[in-house]
């Protein structure tokens, strides 16, 4: 094999004495490959999907299988030259020892996967492209083989401490969003164009569809060492941000269409001016909020990597910390401004919508230039759009509940219960996804001790994912108590904190998170077994289900409180 400069590429490995085999030195001179396609891949500096010939993969050199180096070669040496930058050549993502697929224990079943293209017959995704067996680069003269990377072991206490601050920040962000929604519900646009309430969960859910998915993908990339190279890192960041803007614009437009349809069904009334207003407000809000939050998210991921914090623990909560507040404030401001222009400057709304839609082809071109995000442009729409529809149904429940003057107090708590549930389940999904990327290959699950069936297997066990589920569930009650008391101190909402109200509210919150965590455990493993990337597919569904479950359980709680006569302060006064 040669790099772009035409020099031969060699593998150099040496084992430590502790490995039991003494020092061994293998030098493998690979055949020169002259191919324009290969050189283009080297020059692109972006991880790509390709299929490696099984004959080359299992070529026997000096009596030793390349794919089956003995256990004596578990520690590999690097040659460092000051004028060269090296990129890694690693198989840790799909062939880690804990899955039973160690190089020294190749079986016929494992050999079948050696030449397998993980995109054939399966849903390709950005992380799939990012985590293939080998990365090719043109920056170094040598290809270096490294041992499998592992996330440092963390106790439940360390995990809880890392999650605590981002969790509280995210919680206070949702509290702020709830208080803002409690205020803006009295604005003219929310009173006269009630379909805006249907937009609220769908647009707030963009943090689950886009921001948290971005955070999870980049967290996985950091944990498996795919953002160590500055060029690879910025290629992934730029491609992901462009992709996210495409998705935000499309989802914003479709959310407006869903709000128009769901708002028309109950009463059968349709207003063209209101429809244009909804489309303009939704598209503009989705675009601006997604861009701001995406930039913040990239900063969080890069900062976590530099400080040595596991980004799986902090990225997804911080992605949502002020996301709800930013999105809701932008939606209220834009929709109210466009509503005030309906009579005198009626052409402003369609121009705003057309402007942001016209930018979509530019973002598509940028995202398509990066192979790691090009696949998501084709295969990543199903979960995003489906999640938007699910969140819109939750918005319809909110719109119907707010229409009842006795239940208007639900507004301030809706972003809180939805946001907290979505944040916690996104952390769990991101952690499970990283675990699977490090311990197995797509389509196969790692060997795990058999336990009881769902939902209890999620919470009972000694595995790292069991511990994280337990820790996250324990955050629910103290977290919500803090946020409820904060709302009470700010004198926001229309509901007094009676004992009965707190008990009923906490029961709904615990039931929501308990349900989401075991669904996440089942869903992430199911997507992995089907060869789909859980980072891109599971989190949109889970956060949308969190919105739907949270809104529905909260509405039932307020109905129950009203029926049993708990109207102190009055519920919904």
Swiss-Prot record:
UniProt GO BP: cobalt ion transport; iron ion transport; magnesium ion transport; manganese ion transport; metal ion transport; nickel cation transport
Gene3D superfamilies given in the database record: SLC41 divalent cation transporters, integral membrane domain
Coiled-coil residue windows: none
Segment forming the signal sequence: none
Main subcellular location of this protein, as a coarse class: membrane
InterPro entries: SLC41_membr_dom, SLC41_membr_dom_sf, SLC41A1-3
Extracellular side: 1-162, 217-245, 304-313, 369-376, 428-469, 520-543
A Pfam family annotated for this UniProt entry: MgtE
Membrane topology term: Multi-pass membrane protein
PTM-bearing positions, type Phosphoserine: 137-138
Superkingdom in the source lineage: Eukaryota
Cytoplasmic compartment residues: 184-195, 267-282, 335-347, 398-406, 491-498, 565-573
Molecular function in Gene Ontology: inorganic cation transmembrane transporter activity; monoatomic cation transmembrane transporter activity
GO cellular component, one term: plasma membrane
Known role: Acts as a plasma-membrane magnesium transporter. Can also mediate the transport of other divalent metal cations in an order of Ba(2+) > Ni(2+) > Co(2+) > Fe(2+) > Mn(2+).
The name this protein goes by in its record: Solute carrier family 41 member 2
């Amino acid at each position: 094999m040669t790099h772009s400069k035409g020099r031969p590429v060699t593998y150099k490995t040496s084992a430590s004495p502790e490995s039991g085999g003494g020092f061994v030195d293998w030098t493998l001179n690979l055949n020169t490959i002259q191919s324009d396609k290969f050189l283009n891949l080297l020059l692109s500096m972006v991880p790509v999907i390709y299929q490696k010939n099984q004959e080359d993969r299992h070529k026997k050199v000096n009596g030793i299988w390349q794919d089956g180096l003995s256990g004596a070669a578990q520690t590999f040496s690097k040659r460092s030259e000051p004028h060269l930058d090296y990129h890694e050549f690693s198989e840790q993502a799909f062939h880690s020892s804990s899955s039973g697929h160690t190089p020294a224990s190749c079986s016929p079943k494992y050999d079948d996967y050696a030449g397998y293209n993980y995109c054939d017959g399966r849903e390709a995704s950005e992380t799939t492209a990012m985590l293939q067996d080998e990365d090719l680069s043109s920056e170094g003269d040598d290809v270096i083989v490294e041992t499998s990377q592992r996330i440092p072991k963390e106790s439940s206490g360390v995990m809880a401490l890392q999650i605590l601050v981002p969790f509280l920040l995210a919680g206070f962000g949702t509290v702020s969003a709830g208080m803002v929604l409690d205020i803006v519900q009295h604005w003219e646009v929310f009173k006269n164009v009630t379909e805006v309430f249907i937009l609220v969960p769908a647009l707030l859910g963009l943090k689950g569809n886009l921001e948290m998915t971005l955070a999870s993908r980049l967290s996985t990339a950091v944990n498996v060492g795919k953002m160590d190279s500055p060029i690879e890192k910025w290629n992934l960041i730029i491609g992901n941000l462009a992709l996210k803007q495409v998705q935000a614009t499309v989802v914003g437009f479709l959310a407006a269409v869903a709000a128009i349809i769901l708002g028309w069904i109950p009463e059968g009334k349709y207003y063209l001016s209101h429809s244009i207003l909804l489309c303009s407000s939704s598209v503009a809000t989705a675009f601006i909020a997604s861009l701001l939050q995406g930039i913040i998210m990239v900063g969080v991921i890069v900062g976590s990597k530099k400080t040595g914090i596991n980004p799986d623990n902090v990225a997804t909560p911080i992605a949502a910390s002020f996301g709800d507040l930013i999105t809701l404030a932008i939606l209220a401001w834009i929709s109210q401004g466009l509503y005030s222009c309906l009579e005198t400057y009626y052409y402003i709304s369609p121009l705003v919508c057309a402007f942001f839609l016209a930018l979509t082809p530019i973002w598509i071109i940028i995202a398509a230039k990066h192979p790691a995000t090009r696949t998501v442009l084709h295969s990543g729409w199903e979960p995003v759009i489906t999640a938007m529809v699910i969140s819109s149904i939750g918005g319809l429940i909110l719109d119907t509940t707010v229409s009842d003057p006795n239940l208007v107090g639900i507004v301030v708590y809706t972003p809180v219960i939805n946001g907290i549930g979505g944040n916690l389940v996104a952390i769990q999904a991101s952690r499970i996804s990283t675990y699977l990327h490090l311990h197995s290959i797509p389509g196969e699950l790692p060997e795990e001790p058999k336990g009881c069936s769902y939902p209890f297997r999620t919470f009972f066990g000694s595995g790292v994912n069991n511990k994280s589920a337990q820790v996250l569930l324990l955050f629910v009650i103290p977290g919500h108590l803090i946020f409820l008391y904060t709302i009470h101190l700010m004198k926001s909402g229309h509901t007094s904190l009676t004992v009965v109200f707190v008990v009923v509210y906490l029961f709904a919150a615990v039931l929501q998170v308990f349900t989401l965590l075991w669904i996440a455990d089942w869903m992430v493993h199911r997507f992995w077994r089907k060869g789909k990337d859980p980072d891109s597919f599971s989190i949109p569904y889970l956060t949308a289900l969190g919105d739907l479950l949270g809104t529905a359980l909260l509405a039932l709680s307020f109905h129950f409180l009203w029926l049993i006569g708990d109207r102190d302060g009055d519920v919904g006064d």
